[in-house]
């Protein structure tokens, strides 16, 4: 009977025979399949890991059997905050805890039975990987795509450290609860904005979920509009606002500038300064994400000054509001509350004027296009023409011009943290900023560093690390103390997998350009606007440097859903609703666990765990095992054989070919739940056939072998065992995936239901080539139906070909 012993038996056999080793010399039908690598946390693999990895492995196994040369590597995204925070809390060094966790997770991943190419493993915290992280930084620096400037960061005055946006919860440090402030620090950036237009355009060329592409488009935020120049009343000060709806310019009733805008000090009246300063301090405690939340109430404070609308000379009040970001556009917006929901909410709260200038809609705010009204000589123009006409007018008077704007900002990559890749830069008093020569890489991360937070980069405390010599002049110099954002590690790891043992280069161009890009990439949708965008940028940058000959890293992308606890809530130790894969595997075996995950949930949606579901799957696997045993006995018995293809044989052959077709199509589209449902139907057909008095053993043998083949990707250990039970040659994964026969899917007979007034009264088998009239006659004359029609008036007979006949009668 199937159990974890079966799993271990075949895992050992696969290891001994190196069955899944990728042959890079076979260039035909290559298939690079990749799941997002995981962070090596201290806990075991959870249900989410399994839901990501196991179904994708099933897809890849099917593709292997279909003749593809599958490359499916695995590794660990091993730098990052969790290990550093854990070290601060426990005193265990990040390197020690991380390597221990990697060892544990490697064993757990191998127990899954996935056909990962472990010989191609990468671990980002090891020098043989982050050496090339540093090389990548140097290439970007060499091509003016890496630069340094001052930038505001989240600062916890209690922990004396910089916090990432995700570490700020409702304006407070998630670790200690202290209110977070903003602080300016000198930071390193990658110039992703040089590629914004191409990143937008090439989304049309990749097979990604539309929602994910829409998220990236929104994040990059391309806007075509107009820069409008406002003058501050009673002064010489001018400022620009960017708008995509310049046709509403006559409806501006106030303007809002960001709290960080340089204008604030110069436009704030004396009597408003105290309130303004309080507001600015409060704004420092909010992250950009929080400030732009659509559910958060908009707030603001008046400066006491007025701006002059350039189109009509009208004075409008100048406010500051934290929902306006200084990093987007000009850090100032014109407010048209009649035609913008955010402006309407703000104006209503602070009792500011609301004036309609676009016709349409029964209520305000009206945000759609329409005819301009209350707009002087522009009245009657429809929005597109109005935009063009007003922009031209502003250009003529020198107070505006057309412009394309983007929300995307350059990627801030420096972190004041220890557990990350050291930035390969040296600072020399004589020579300035000097890149570390490539021959001196890696700049190794020192082990003995005091990294308790005190507001400075931990590496500053290591004199041995910091003190070096300038590679240009040879004088004493200092190293950069910041480390790289861990998203840099994952921005190119898919390239290193294919050439992970190369000690001379990050990767061999010829080798990479044959195997890449990744054909199928799978991971969570939460990475849409960071990792997935950064990887696209790095690919394009390396292409332009001459290292790659392709434009996109991941041709196809799929997202897995979330497995929830039995209570329908997100799994959490504190809620007591977690599911341990290890416990499930020990009880049922990894294939039962794998198949339940694929059958019990839509892969893209996920859902709530159900203990009854995995129990049912265990029973299903046991049932298959019994059927295989019965069929083996039948084949070996030599009794009650026949060679003819009668009705029962045709029905079995139909089920066989229909299942092959359906499973191939459904699993190919990541619809694993319906693929396994088809396998269950196929199982029922097999069981039904072996109850026949006489059997076509040749057909039965071919059918059971095809059955084991199509279940193999979903239950690999179990399928290998049944393949061996049937006396077949190792391994089933060297077998060719079965192909369906279209002729077998053409039925000579079909079962239809006969209804009277919509209620089923009988079922009959009829030839598939009958006309509607012949079907009507057969139905009405059926022995079970005739008595029910006596004394009734048949009004009409409805035929639904291949499904049913409905006889409509009246007394």
Curated annotation (Swiss-Prot):
Gene Ontology CC annotation, any one: cytosol
Entry keyword Ligase: yes
Name the UniProt record assigns to this protein: Leucine--tRNA ligase
Annotated organism of origin: Clostridium kluyveri (strain ATCC 8527 / DSM 555 / NBRC 12016 / NCIMB 10680 / K1)
Enzyme class: ligase
Protein's GO biological process: leucyl-tRNA aminoacylation
Chemical reaction(s) catalysed: tRNA(Leu) + L-leucine + ATP = L-leucyl-tRNA(Leu) + AMP + diphosphate
Top-level taxonomic group: Bacteria
One Pfam family from the record: tRNA-synt_1_2
Localization in the cell: Cytoplasm
Residues that bind ATP: 573
Entry's EC annotation: 6.1.1.4
Lineage: Bacteria, Bacillati, Bacillota, Clostridia, Eubacteriales
Family: Belongs to the class-I aminoacyl-tRNA synthetase family.
């Amino acid at each position: 009977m199937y159990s974890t012993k079966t799993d271990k038996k075949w895992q050992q056999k696969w290891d001994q025979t190196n069955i899944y080793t990728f042959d890079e010399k076979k260039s035909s039908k290559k298939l690079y399949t990749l799941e997002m690598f995981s962070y090596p946390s201290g806990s075991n693999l959870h249900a989410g890991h399994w839901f990501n990895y196991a179904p994708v492995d099933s897809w890849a196994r099917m593709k292997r059997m279909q003749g593809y040369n599958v490359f499916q590597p695995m590794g660990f995204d091993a730098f990052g905050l969790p290990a550093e925070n854990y070290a601060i809390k426990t005193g265990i060094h990040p390197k020690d805890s991380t390597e221990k966790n990697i060892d544990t997770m490697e064993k757990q991943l191998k127990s899954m039975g996935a056909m990962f190419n472990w010989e191609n493993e990468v671990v980002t915290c090891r020098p043989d990987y982050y050496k090339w992280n540093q090389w990548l930084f140097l290439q970007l620096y060499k091509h003016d795509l890496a630069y340094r400037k001052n930038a505001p960061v989240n600062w916890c005055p209690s922990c004396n450290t910089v916090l990432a946006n995700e570490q700020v919860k409702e304006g407070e440090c998630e670790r200690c609860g202290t209110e977070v402030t903003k602080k300016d620090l000198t930071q390193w950036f990658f110039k992703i904005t040089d590629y914004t237009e191409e990143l937008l355009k090439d989304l049309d060329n990749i097979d990604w979920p539309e929602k994910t592409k829409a998220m990236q488009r929104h994040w990059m935020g391309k806007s075509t509009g107009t820069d409008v120049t406002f003058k501050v009343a009673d002064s010489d000060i001018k400022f620009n606002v960017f708008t995509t709806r310049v046709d509403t310019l006559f409806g501006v009733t106030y303007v809002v500038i960001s709290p960080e805008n340089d204008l604030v000090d110069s436009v704030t009246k004396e009597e408003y300064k105290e309130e303004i300063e309080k507001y600015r301090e409060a704004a420092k405690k909010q992250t950009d994400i929080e400030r732009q939340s659509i559910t958060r109430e908009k707030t603001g404070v008046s400066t006491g000054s007025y701006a002059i609308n350039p189109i009509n000379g009208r004075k409008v009040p100048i406010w500051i509001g934290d929902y306006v970001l200084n990093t987007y556009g000009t850090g100032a917006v014109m407010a048209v509350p009649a035609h913008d929901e955010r402006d309407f909410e703000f104006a209503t709260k602070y009792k500011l004027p609301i004036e309609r200038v676009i016709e349409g809609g029964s209520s305000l705010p009206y945000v759609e296009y329409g005819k301009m009204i209350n707009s002087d000589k522009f009245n009657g123009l429809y929005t597109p023409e109005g935009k063009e006409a007003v922009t031209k007018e502003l250009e003529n008077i020198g107070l505006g011009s057309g412009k394309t704007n983007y929300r995307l900002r350059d990627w801030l990559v420096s972190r004041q943290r220890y557990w990350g890749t050291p930035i390969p830069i040296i600072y020399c008093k004589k020579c300035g900023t000097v890149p570390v020569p490539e021959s001196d890489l890696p700049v190794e991360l020192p082990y003995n560093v005091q990294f308790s937070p005190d507001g400075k980069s931990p590496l500053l405390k290591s004199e041995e690390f910091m003190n070096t010599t300038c590679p240009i002049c040879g004088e004493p110099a200092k190293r950069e103390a910041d480390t790289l954002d861990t998203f840099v590690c994952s921005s190119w790891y898919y390239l290193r997998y294919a050439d992970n043992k190369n000690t001379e280069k990050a990767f061999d161009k010829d080798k990479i350009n044959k195997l890449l890009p990744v054909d199928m990439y799978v991971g969570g949708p939460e990475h849409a606007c960071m990792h997935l965008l950064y990887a696209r940028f790095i690919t394009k940058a390396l292409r332009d440097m001459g290292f790659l000959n392709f434009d996109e890293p991941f041709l196809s992308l799929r997202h897995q859903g979330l497995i929830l606890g039995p209570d329908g809530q997100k799994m959490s130790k504190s809620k007591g609703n977690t599911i341990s894969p290890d416990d499930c595997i020990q009880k049922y075996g990894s294939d039962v666990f794998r198949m339940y995950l694929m059958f019990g949930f839509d892969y893209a949606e996920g859902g709530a765990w159900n203990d009854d579901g995995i129990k049912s799957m265990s029973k299903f696997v046991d049932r298959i095992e019994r059927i295989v045993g019965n069929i083996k006995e039948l084949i070996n018995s030599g009794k009650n054989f026949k060679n003819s293809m009668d009705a029962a044989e045709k029905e079995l052959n139909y089920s066989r070919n229909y299942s092959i077709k359906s499973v191939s199509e459904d699993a190919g589209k990541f619809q694993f739940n319906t693929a396994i449902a088809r396998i269950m139907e196929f199982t029922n057909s097999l069981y039904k056939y072996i109850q026949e008095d006489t059997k076509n053993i040749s057909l039965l043998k071919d059918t059971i072998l095809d059955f084991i083949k199509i279940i193999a990707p979903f239950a690999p250990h179990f399928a290998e065992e049944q393949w061996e039970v049937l006396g077949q040659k190792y391994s089933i994964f060297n077998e060719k995936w079965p192909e369906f026969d279209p002729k077998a899917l053409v039925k000579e007979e079909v079962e239809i239901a006969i209804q009277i007034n919509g209620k089923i009264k009988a079922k009959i088998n009829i030839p598939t080539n009958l006309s509607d009239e012949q079907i009507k006659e057969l139905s009405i004359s059926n022995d079970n139906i005739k008595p029910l029609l006596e004394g009734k008036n048949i009004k009409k007979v409805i035929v639904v070909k291949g499904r049913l006949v409905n006889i409509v009668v009246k007394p």
